[in-house]
UniProtKB/Swiss-Prot annotation:
Organism: Streptomyces coelicolor (strain ATCC BAA-471 / A3(2) / M145)
Keyword Amino-acid biosynthesis on entry: yes
Protein name: Imidazole glycerol phosphate synthase subunit HisH
InterPro entries associated with the record: Class_I_gatase-like, GATASE, Imidazole-glycPsynth_HisH
NCBIfam families (alphabetical): IMP_synth_hisH (TIGR01855)
Length: 222
């Protein structure tokens, strides 16, 4: 599968900033986004992060450490400001986890960005970490997984996850977030599409053709 080159009506490649706050596979993300047709830059520069068509927030390591690094780089403020203006943001792996209310790792609790209610906790499975390829169950109307077969597999490497989704708008004028699930022992949230904010627990940049199509789908919405 070859990813199409997304561009606006003018043919300009979409500008995507991979936010460099010290906790993420920034080079892998840069290469994957470039292959998907984006004009990519790795930076923590405030103006560039704010003005890009899309902002990608990667994340590896401990929840609390990632939050500290993000705050030190003013990334928490940048994410909030972009979302307040309807500007697209995508989180990957721990970059998704920190979008929730809090994380608990080794009995250490840390506050997240609280864009979504929920707690990141240990995987409830016989084998931890969850490392390798797995399928997902995406909503039928998912934009993120558009064009992908139901048996498409994505690459995961994590020991913590969100096992319950509790956000409900109760407002018929507001679209409910699209939540995608995967299972390792117990079902967990594998991806979320919520207006301008999308995120995946797995690594699309390491997920071969399926990951390339997913990133293309995101870029085409920018």
């Amino acid at each position: 599968m070859t990813a199409a080159v997304p561009a606006g009506a003018t043919g300009r490649a979409k500008k995507v900033v991979v936010f460099d706050y010290g906790f993420g596979n920034v080079r892998s993300a840069e290469r994957a986004l470039a292959r998907a047709g984006a004009d990519v830059e790795i930076t923590r520069d405030y103006d560039k992060a704010m003005n890009a068509d899309g902002l990608l927030v990667p994340g590896v390591g401990a929840f609390a450490a990632c939050m500290e690094g993000l705050k030190a780089a003013r990334g928490d403020w940048i994410v909030d400001r972009r979302l307040s203006g309807g500007r697209p943001v995508m989180g990957i792996c721990v970059g998704m986890q920190i979008l929730f209310s809090r994380g608990i790792e080794h009995d250490v609790e840390a506050e997240g960005l609280d864009e979504w209610p929920g707690t990141v906790g240990p995987l409830e499975a016989d084998v931890v970490p969850h490392m390798g390829w797995n399928t997902v169950e995406a909503p039928a109307d998912s934009q993120l997984f558009a064009g992908l077969d139901a048996d498409a597999r994505f690459y995961f490497v994590h020991s913590y996850a969100v096992h319950e989704w509790t956000q409900e708008s109760h407002n018929p004028l507001i679209a409910e977030p699209r939540v995608t699930w995967s299972t390792h022992g117990k079902p967990f949230v594998a991806a979320v599409e919520n207006g301008a904010l999308w995120a995946t627990q797995f690594h699309p940049e390491k997920s071969g053709d399926a990951g390339a199509q997913l990133l293309t789908n995101w870029i085409e919405t920018l």
